[in-house]
Amino acid sequence: MENNNQSFWQFSDQLRLQASNLANLSLNDSIWSNNYISKRRDERINFDIKVGGEINSFKSKDPACDYNDNVNGSLLAMPYNNNNNNNIILGFGGVGLNGGFNKGIYSKPAFANLNNNINLNINPKGHKGKVEDELFHPSKSSKKNNNLNKKHGDNNNNDNNKDSKAAGDKRFKTLPPSESLPRDETIGGYIFVCNNDTMAENLKRQLFGLPPRYRDSVRAITPGLPLFLYNYSTHQLHGIFEAASFGGTNIDPSAWEDKKCPGESRFPAQVRVITRKTCEPLEEDSFRPILHHYDGPKFRLELNVPEALSLLDIFAEQDTFNDAFEALPA
């Protein structure tokens, strides 16, 4: 019994020692905080408002980082800052009567008050600023620079026009993408073009030729490549021929000589050929579906491997081939 009374009195004494500290607690503090009792009163949070007093008028010393211990050590341990008597807590505006909340509605963000401290250099009198004067009323030096830039711009345009003309001349000597095989495809054959006036010379000289713009294309021809001859006067395809040389330029300058320019051929993109098979010419309806067309009735002269093999198959179906055709590699 005496032990129980002694323990009771010890408990009551401890309770009296803590009474003064408990009296200083507010609703914004946790009584279960481990370090709350060890803090002095001026270090603890106190949102109590005295009549005629200021809200949060006290000034803290060094910022603390303890959980829920004072204004400086708030729930997120945000540092204390005083900006126009507005304490920034939890990233919001000044702390109100309810510790930063006003009937459950957050106050305006602190960054909304930045315009109180930052001068945007706006002239309320409506006078034009320096930047506006430079934009709408340039000085004489700026006008002079603009004229010089305009002059240089005209010179650049003239240079660009010259370059475009040179590029146009270069394109004239080469084939556009629509008339040539893609770069990742291997050339499998070639169709040369003639008419009734030039066909006899093609066969007699065993030389095929095309206009200058086909020079680069014809250079891709190698010996043994299947060749075909299209007569656009009769719209027939003749075959089968084989390249006997590499494609080149002016292999025989006297062939199809240009009367206006003696010693130069009208069809300088040339290759020597041999006849592999003499066949009946093919009509357009039999071979045109195989070819790649562009710009309506025009077809590509460069053949890929499937197109070349398909043309050889059509000629083979006529059963007019000889032993030379049998030796043609597939």
From Swiss-Prot:
Residues 137-181 are annotated as: Disordered. Residues 185-317 form the DCD domain. InterPro entries: Dev_and_cell_death_domain (IPR013989), NRP-like (IPR044832). Its main location: cytoplasm. One of its GO terms (biological process) is response to endoplasmic reticulum stress. Keywords: Cytoplasm, Stress response. GO terms for cellular component: cytoplasm. The keyword Cytoplasm applies. The keyword Amino-acid biosynthesis does not apply. Transmembrane segments: none annotated. It comes from the Eukaryota. Residues 160-172 have a biased composition (Basic and acidic residues). Induction: Induced by tunicamycin, azetidine-2-carboxylate (AZC) and osmotic stress. Induced by dithiothreitol (DTT). Induced by wounding. Disulfide bonds: none annotated. It is found in: Cytoplasm. Over expression of NRP in protoplasts induces caspase-3-like activity and promotes extensive DNA fragmentation. Transient expression of NRP in planta causes leaf yellowing, chlorophyll loss, malondialdehyde production, ethylene accumulation, and induction of the senescence marker gene CP1. Involved in stress signaling pathway that mediates cell death in response to endoplasmic reticulum (ER) stress and osmotic stress. This is DCD domain-containing protein NRP-B.
